[in-house]
């Protein structure tokens, strides 16, 4: 297995630390006036999502993590697992609830949404939904004219169960585009 020396550390690099795959978020090289140089590294554990800070002496090395990101289409949920398919090889993969985390509220069955799946040794670690999804509003209060004292927005429940703030003119049954990274309403589609 390949390994990376401290002089090869950079943001986005995926390494193994204490048996867990981690992604380097920040790397700072420190050369004190007295003593050996070292790297102060901020890492995110890809399994738990926790961010930790470590220091490594100059010249130390870490093993490369067998982590890869792949684009796959979302197919369906069978109650326990969420199923995805590679668009070219038609290979299917299933992700559990921990790998799905917040992605659950943005994915609709048979939508063929192209998701980014992070695989570690062939098993899904995390699922990132597309940046924008188009979902139908199943429940929202009617927007009454002149009811803008609170900033001009109202909560709306989408067909996947997610709740977003939408403008007053958006009605029940309409399809809206939502940014999955922030959970914000973008525009009305129909």
From Swiss-Prot:
Its main location: cytoplasm. InterPro entries: Elong-fact-P_C, NA-bd_OB-fold, Rib_uL2_dom2, Transl_elong_fac_P/YeiP, Transl_elong_KOW-like, Transl_elong_P/YeiP_cen, Transl_elong_P/YeiP_CS, Transl_elongation_fac_P. GO terms for molecular function: translation elongation factor activity. Keywords: Cytoplasm, Elongation factor, Hydroxylation, Protein biosynthesis. It is found in: Cytoplasm. One of its GO terms (cellular component) is cytoplasm. Pathway: Protein biosynthesis; polypeptide chain elongation. It comes from the Bacteria. The keyword Aminoacyl-tRNA synthetase does not apply. SUPFAM superfamilies: Nucleic acid-binding proteins, Translation proteins SH3-like domain. GO terms for biological process: peptide biosynthetic process. Gene3D superfamilies: 2.30.30.30, Nucleic acid-binding proteins (2.40.50.140). The modification N6-(3,6-diaminohexanoyl)-5-hydroxylysine is found at residue 34. The keyword Cytoplasm applies. CDD domains: S1_EF-P_repeat_1 (cd04470), S1_EF-P_repeat_2 (cd05794). May be beta-lysylated on the epsilon-amino group of Lys-34 by the combined action of EpmA and EpmB, and then hydroxylated on the C5 position of the same residue by EpmC (if this protein is present). Lysylation is critical for the stimulatory effect of EF-P on peptide-bond formation. The lysylation moiety may extend toward the peptidyltransferase center and stabilize the terminal 3-CCA end of the tRNA. Hydroxylation of the C5 position on Lys-34 may allow additional potential stabilizing hydrogen-bond interactions with the P-tRNA. Involved in peptide bond synthesis. Alleviates ribosome stalling that occurs when 3 or more consecutive Pro residues or the sequence PPG is present in a protein, possibly by augmenting the peptidyl transferase activity of the ribosome. Modification of Lys-34 is required for alleviation. PANTHER family: ELONGATION FACTOR P (PTHR30053), ELONGATION FACTOR P (EF-P) FAMILY PROTEIN (PTHR30053:SF12). Belongs to the elongation factor P family. This is Elongation factor P. It comes from Psychrobacter cryohalolentis (strain ATCC BAA-1226 / DSM 17306 / VKM B-2378 / K5).
């Amino acid at each position: 297995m390949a390994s990376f020396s401290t002089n090869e550390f950079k943001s986005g690099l995926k390494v193994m630390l204490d048996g867990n795959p981690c992604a380097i978020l920040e790397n700072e090289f420190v050369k004190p006036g007295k003593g050996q140089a070292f790297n102060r590294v901020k890492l995110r554990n890809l399994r738990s999502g926790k961010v930790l800070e470590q220091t490594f002496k100059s010249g130390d090395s870490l093993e490369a993590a067998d982590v890869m990101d792949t684009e796959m289409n979302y197919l369906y949920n069978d109650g326990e697992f969420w199923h995805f398919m590679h668009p070219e090889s038609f290979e299917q993969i299933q992700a559990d609830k921990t790998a799905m985390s917040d992605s659950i509220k943005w994915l609709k069955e048979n939508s063929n949404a192209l998701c980014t799946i992070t695989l570690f040794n062939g098993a899904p670690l995390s699922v990132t939904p597309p940046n924008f999804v188009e979902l139908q509003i199943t429940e929202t209060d009617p927007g009454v004219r002149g009811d803008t004292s609170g900033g001009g927005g109202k909560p709306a429940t989408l067909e996947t169960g997610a709740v977003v703030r939408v403008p007053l003119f958006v009605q029940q049954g309409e399809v809206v585009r939502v940014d999955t990274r922030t959970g914000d309403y973008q525009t009305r589609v129909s």
